[in-house]
Amino acid sequence: MRSRLRPATPPPVVVIPPMPTPPMGAPLEMRVPAKAEDGTRQTVNYGISTSQTIWNFRSAYNVAALNCVEVQFTPILEGYKRFLKVYDKSLDRASKEIDASFRTQHSGRAAIVARETYQTQVYNFFSLPPVDSSFCQAAMEVSAELNTVEPSQFDNWSYTGLAKLEAPFKAFFDAYDQYRADLAAWQSRYGSNGLITVRPNAEQVMAQPVVQPQASVPQAQ
């Protein structure tokens, strides 16, 4: 008498969540500035002098004036023009001090090239496409705040201004680090392509029919 086999319990349904994606439409792979031991992001603005802070603020504001061209950001360009006039003495002094600093490290033409190379890095830093919108909004706020900063106060305020323009980029880098951590965890659990293998459990193994070997039948000679 043939015994009845219980139907095997189907394997559990595994719902795979969407694979994490980069923030703000960023590339799947990109390098972001590392963090120092104290958690400070080591960007091009990390550990710089007051004169370099002033000049990096100028560079960042210049990028905003050129790139934030939507109608709602019109005050940025007007604010930048005012900035160049009102704080011209601080800017001139900072530029001369920066030149002198590079000349202590390089000689002749090499000092000019070194400064231009560094400054290109600064411009590129503030031109990161995924951060455009939040950067322009920060530049709007800085433009309004500059109206209250006296020329005699600008050198000290430049640290505040640069930090505000840099903040959207630091937030993006933090978000990108989180994306990479989330992606690594997702791939560890679901595989690089989201394909997983569900192995049968003990109940399913026991419920499988046992295949009996068939006896061989002698063939007629």
Language model segments and positions:
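Bacterial Sec signal peptide processing site at the extreme N-terminus
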Residues: 1-15
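Mid-length scaffold segments of soluble, non-membrane domains
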Residues: 68-132
